[in-house]
Amino acid sequence: MPKYVEGKLNAEGLRFGIVVGRFNSFIGERLLEGALDALLRHGANDAQITVVRVPGAFEIPLTAQKMAGSGNYDALICLGAVIRGSTPHFDYVSSEVSKGIAHVSLATGVPVAFGVLTTDTIEQAIERAGTKAGNKGFDAAMTVIEIANVFKEMK
């Protein structure tokens, strides 16, 4: 019979780092509230969580890489909002941020959740930060709780 590995939604004893961009902070703060809510509901306590605020989304991957390399975290959550404007800036930032966050996870082996909203409008961002479409910060935290437990099981 094969061995099955499944992550549990139990944050007890795990160490979490959260990187949140301050640009569009009215969205980032709602995402952070959602992530903290998920972690605390699933057994984490404040001592297990470090929140690092950075200027904007572009600074998130480098900060996450530094945190992942420290050995102090079982999982990371990256939060922020990039909202389309009238210039191509959105395309460059959203592309590099998503690639950068994926690279951190692959290069370090530390689970990293992508909770950076990339939306066409402010309304879409608001919907995904705790109104109609749920809270993507909460969802990102649930993802890393589960995958951190999968990794723990695989040791």
Curated annotation (Swiss-Prot):
Q: Organism's domain of life?
A: Bacteria
- Gene Ontology cellular-component terms listed: cytosol; riboflavin synthase complex
| UniProt-annotated binding residues for 5-amino-6-(D-ribitylamino)uracil | 23, 57-59, 81-83, 114
List, alphabetically, the SUPFAM superfamilies matched: Lumazine synthase
**Annotated keywords:** Riboflavin biosynthesis, Transferase
Q: Could you give a GO molecular-function term held by this entry?
A: 6,7-dimethyl-8-ribityllumazine synthase activity
* Binding annotation for (2S)-2-hydroxy-3-oxobutyl phosphate: 86-87, 128
State what this protein does.
Catalyzes the formation of 6,7-dimethyl-8-ribityllumazine by condensation of 5-amino-6-(D-ribitylamino)uracil with 3,4-dihydroxy-2-butanone 4-phosphate. This is the penultimate step in the biosynthesis of riboflavin.
Q: What is this protein called?
A: 6,7-dimethyl-8-ribityllumazine synthase
Q: Which organism is it from?
A: Citrifermentans bemidjiense (strain ATCC BAA-1014 / DSM 16622 / JCM 12645 / Bem) (Geobacter bemidjiensis)
The opening ranks of the lineage are:
Bacteria, Pseudomonadati, Thermodesulfobacteriota, Desulfuromonadia, Geobacterales
